[in-house]
């Protein structure tokens, strides 16, 4: 979130709120984007939201979903990865000799498109740094996939199969997105 704020918002934030950044950081790196808090951002379907609300909007918790999934399927879950703090490559910390192929990802939300546009960060780096709209991965057998999707949807949280796992000579993640194929 700190990176997003500095990548998206302009220097007027630093001038108005000098306590919002560490004075030891080079000035050219702080609030280097072009947006103000009140700039309208297109979020699709003819709707807009201010940049401030978009960047600072709360994140829903997965706790109720995960509790219900664990209550019913704990012994069938092969892995769970919360993609914050490691993004789409975080799973690399937990595997050996597996290839994780993510080729059916959710659409990238407007917030991450805005960060990409403002920061000029490559899409490959975006998937390595940000969750890109999906924060939780469950690695489960095909037989229980629909049950888990149904549980998630009962809490009005979208869920879908985003890829698959294959054996490999080494650990690897491949992301296939509208913005390219990236191998980590």
Outline where the language-model segments fall.
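Helix-biased detector of long, well-ordered alpha-helical tracts
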Residues: 1-184
């Amino acid at each position: 979130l700190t990176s997003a704020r500095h990548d998206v918002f302009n220097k007027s934030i630093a001038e108005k709120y000098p306590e919002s950044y560490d004075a030891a950081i080079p000035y050219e790196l702080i609030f280097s984007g072009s947006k103000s808090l009140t700039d309208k951002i297109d979020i699709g379907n003819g709707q807009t939201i201010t940049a401030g609300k978009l960047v600072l909007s709360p994140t829903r918790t997965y706790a109720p979903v995960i509790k219900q999934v664990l209550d019913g399927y704990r012994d069938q879950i092969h892995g769970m990865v919360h993609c914050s703090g490691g993004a789409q490559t975080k799973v690399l910390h937990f595997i050996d000799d597996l290839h994780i192929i993510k080729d059916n990802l959710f659409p990238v939300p407007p917030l991450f498109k805005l960060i990409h546009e403002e920061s000029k960060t490559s899409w490959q780096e975006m998937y390595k740094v940000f969750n890109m709209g999906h924060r939780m991965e469950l690695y489960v057998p095909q037989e229980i996939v629909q049950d888990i999707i149904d549980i998630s949807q009962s809490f009005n949280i979208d869920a879908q199969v985003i890829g698959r796992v294959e054996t490999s000579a080494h650990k690897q993640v491949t992301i296939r997105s509208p913005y390219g194929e990236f191998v980590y």
